[in-house]
């Protein structure tokens, strides 16, 4: 059996029907940035507030995904690409169900983020750059990962010995190095209300 033998089954409920019932558009809000920039914190705080306001929302967090779906992947460039490919496909399924998907992944490579953008319709992928200087992320170091990377205990660590390619034209920039996480969360929620309501 090959992929040519597998047939895509159309859903009985369309994306538009879900969106009409939810009273908002579906979208991927792809939070990208260095470890320690605040992606997960901002994503979860925004999701909580949006949920309380009646939005259908889910957070897909990089660490959590690596405990399950992507636990077989390491941190080589190839594994990082596969990590993002898989989560892009999962996010697409949620978009088809009328959900706002907030992802929190370092996703260091522009090409990988672009491939996720191409999975969904125009306007359904919104790149959100959580901007924060490396030195601030290292000072925060909530998981102790930068210290381990500097000591050679973690190879291929983004920002230390593996590159992070900043977004060139993100739909939104949240500067978590200059603004507290509450302000960043509020900016993200305002973006959702303006773009998806």
Curated annotation (Swiss-Prot):
It is an enzyme of class 2 (transferase). GO terms for molecular function: adenylylsulfate kinase activity; ATP binding. Its EC number is 2.7.1.25. The keyword Kinase applies. GO terms for biological process: hydrogen sulfide biosynthetic process; sulfate assimilation. ATP binds at residues 33-40. Keywords: ATP-binding, Kinase, Nucleotide-binding, Phosphoprotein, Transferase. Catalyzes the synthesis of activated sulfate. This is Probable adenylyl-sulfate kinase. It comes from Bacillus subtilis (strain 168).
